[in-house]
A protein has these predicted regions:
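C-terminal membrane-solvent junction of multi-pass transporters and transport-like membrane proteins
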Residues: 5, 327-330, 374-425
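Helix-loop-helix connectors at the membrane interface of multi-pass transporters/channels
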Residues: 77, 104-127, 163, 221-225, ...
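Helix-loop-helix junctions that connect adjacent transmembrane segments
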Residues: 7, 41, 121-126, 151-289, ...
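Hydrophobic transmembrane alpha-helices that form the core helical bundles
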Residues: 56-60, 68-135, 140, 296-310, ...
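Membrane-interface loop-to-helix entry segments
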Residues: 111, 128-180, 210, 233-238, ...
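TM-loop-TM module centered on a large, flexible mid-protein loop between adjacent transmembrane helices
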Residues: 74-75, 81, 235-301, 320-369
Length: 481
């Protein structure tokens, strides 16, 4: 991006981008189902102690790579070299595969609310079969161009934000007016128990507070530079944390936590709100269902093609075959997108075998999505730790405090993420075969494949090129400048 186009995003614009990237009403539902009102303080703690420092970590990487439109691959390569950069970029794409398994059933459920006014209850097998068909359709549409996707998604995202704020205001007003909440709001209910099961669910909280990697890339584009960026990120983190916490406190004003479903929980709470205020419940269900369905279907189309395109465009040529990464007339690697489809199929089928209901199925896939989502930030944190330990002399306009501060902050984050990852990968009460073949097996197979592919690529390089690829890119750039 040219300098003339830099410094064009105002503080409010960055605040809006941050909110859109991070906040989701469905995250409130998911965590309320699992840990109830204890999610309220945990959301706030996650945004303060994870989202804000992680944003600052990425902002430092962007500052280090200021002459490039940096992505995950470039950030990690600048500190750890090519192999770990490839593994990190690969995990971002790999996490997306698990994300589909939790997104697809929701799209189906909200379609039911939109067109029927209620959720048509499906078995896990039927849910998986419909998800396969829906994903095939989404892959076809996204690889053949979807020009109206952007405007539609923008409108529905705005409507979802409006609905969320409306619910908070109306539920808060009802509470102030003397309504007894369906689940009592007490200090005892909000105190976390920090059991192994609870630690596993904290990954859901961290996943909900994610999005820093899509926001921090704008550090060079904000009016006022890095100082303004830091101020806005801190304000945004506090605002999002407070909003998540308030929404979590009010989510059970009209509906009991144990009656909420992962697939249609958003509609359920609005149905309860409609019943309290005497509004037509069926119309409310259809409206919220339609908005949610449109927003999630748009998200499905976007995430079907975009991560594939980004991943295969930023990694070195030669790791994958030319036909795999070849772009079609719409600028999408269609063959790679269909390979992605074939990989997701078993990820949807395997948890179905150990699930008695669609709710059980969703619990399994959301848990694994949350566990897998810990890996990419973990690699970035390890790269940052190496940057502050061994490469802190490299010039950059922005640093997250002193060397000691940076090392201390990222070390705490690495410890928290490591425990959360283990707790969610080995959840209490889960089927042991599901854990071995799905949770552990999926990660081992996918990361093992990435390691093998990079070994083959490295073997094709000359000794000089191999040594250069292994060295931190920021160090190489400094030596050649």
């Amino acid at each position: 991006m040219s300098d003339s186009k830099r410094n064009t995003i105002g503080k409010f614009g960055l605040l809006s981008l941050t909110f859109a990237a991070v906040f989701s009403f469905n995250n409130v539902i998911n965590n309320n189902i699992e840990i109830g009102l204890a999610s309220a303080p945990m959301f706030f703690l996650a945004t303060i102690f994870y989202f804000i420092p992680f944003c600052l970590i990425i902002a430092e990487f962007v500052s280090l790579n200021k002459n490039s439109e940096a992505g995950v691959y470039a950030w990690v390569k600048s500190s750890l070299g090519g192999r770990w950069a490839f593994i990190s970029a690969y995990t971002y794409w790999f996490v997306n595969l698990f994300f589909f398994t939790s997104l697809l059933p929701r799209v189906i459920a909200y379609a039911s609310y939109a067109f029927l006014g209620y959720e048509y209850i499906l078995t896990p097998v039927a849910t998986t079969a419909l998800s396969m068909v829906l994903f095939a359709f989404a892959t076809y549409v996204s690889t053949n161009g979807a020009k109206m996707l952007g405007p539609i998604t923008s409108v529905t995202s705005s409507l979802m934000l409006l609905l969320t704020l409306s619910y908070i205001l109306l539920a808060g007003a009802a509470l102030v007016g003397g309504v007894q909440p369906a689940d009592p709001i007490t200090v005892e209910a909000m105190v976390p128990d920090f059991s192994w099961a609870f630690l596993g669910i904290t990954t859901w909280i961290f996943m909900a507070a994610g999005g820093a990697e899509s926001v921090a890339v704008y550090v060079n584009d904000v009016k006022g530079g890095s100082k303004s960026f830091v101020k806005v990120i801190i304000v945004a983190g506090i605002f999002i944390g407070v909003l998540y916490s308030i929404a979590s406190l009010l989510i059970n004003v009209f509906v009991h936590s144990d009656t909420l479903k992962y697939t249609g929980g958003s509609v359920q709470v609005f149905e309860g709100l409609a019943a309290h205020f005497g509004l037509p419940e069926i119309l409310m269900n259809r409206f919220v269902g339609l908005v949610s369905f449109t927003a999630m279907f748009g998200s499905l189309l976007m995430w079907t093609a975009t991560p594939v395109k980004i991943f295969f465009s930023e990694i070195p040529a030669g790791i994958f075959g030319k036909k795999t990464v070849e772009l079609n007339e719409n600028g999408v690697p269609a063959r790679a997108a269909w390979i992605q489809y074939l990989i997701v199929l078993p990820l949807m089928v395997i948890p179905t075998l150990g699930s008695n209901t669609a709710q059980d199925l969703m619990n399994t896939v959301i848990n694994m999505t949350a566990a897998a989502s810990m890996l990419p930030p973990l690699f970035i944190m390890l790269a940052y730790l190496n940057l502050r330990l061994k490469l802190d002399h490299l010039p950059r306009e922005f640093k997250m405090g002193s060397r000691t501060t940076g090392i201390a902050v990222v070390s705490v984050l690495i410890a928290i993420f490591s425990v959360g990852f283990l707790a969610s990968t080995f959840p209490t009460g889960a089927d042991i075969l599901t854990i071995i073949f799905y949770n552990v097996g999926g990660i081992v197979i996918f990361l093992g494949f990435a390691w093998w592919k990079y070994n083959r690529y490295e073997a094709s390089l000359s000794a000089e090129a191999r040594a250069k690829e292994a060295e931190p890119a920021a160090q190489v750039a400094m030596q050649t400048s």
